[in-house]
Amino acid sequence: MINIKAGKSGYFSKPSQTLDPHLFDGEHLKPDVRTRLNLLLLDYLDYHYHNAESWTMVWLAGSGISYQWSADRGNGDLDVLFGIDYDKFLESNPDYSYMSREEIAECIDNDLRISLWPKTSHINFSYDAEDYWTLGQDYEVTFFLNPMVDNRANGITNIRPYAAYNITLDEWTTKPPKTPETNFPEEFERQANDNKLLVKTLSDRYNSINSDRSMSIPNSPRYINAQTHVNHIKAEAQSLYDSIHTGRKAAFQSNGGGYSDFYNYQWQKAKADGLVTTLNEIING
């Protein structure tokens, strides 16, 4: 039985008075945090490619470095985004010269997901006397190459980040607001409620037809008919999920509204309302 249950998103949470003290001294990223994140990425890139430091610019980004860091956001995640100088990359890695900018980014991101992410799913930045990183807060750190981000001091502003700290240069590119947006247009809330009603309808239909399928003899006409309906519902759930998730990317394009854009609001509200989890349960059910 699939039912909508409240989810998690720090987007609507009350901000803290300070940035995460496990990561920052005041507004400055702690040197050991900066060094470790930088080395995790550059060591990986240097192992798989050549001369990474010459073509890479690295940022820490997202709500984890905002004043809403203490909210229950599900995973305690940190996003490390980087941009590259594609001309310099190709000079050092000529085997990729036949690929487009987007194809290179996709290739590197796929490698990161497979080879680096599993090793950075539990990262701790507190150092004890026995040389183990075992104290303090655990973080799930994910690394991304965004083809829209350039290898220059403010290159990440192309995707309108809510907050971005330049790890390479050790400075803020985009400081997070101390008082995030809380007054959203009624149209935003209306669309979010429509999404919730639609997901409720899909889950109710799925539960009813799936129950009928489970009581049918496998491969009987009744079973096959129920399976066909289930597949249609899964396709509808996938389409809705894709529209909400993919739509969020529009918020961070050059002509988007960034963190307060409707499409980001819609995604965050879908997470907070449990719609993302429910849709995935239907899709994978």
Language model: regions and residue ranges:
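Catalytic core of pol beta-like nucleotidyltransferases
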Residues: 2-75, 83-285
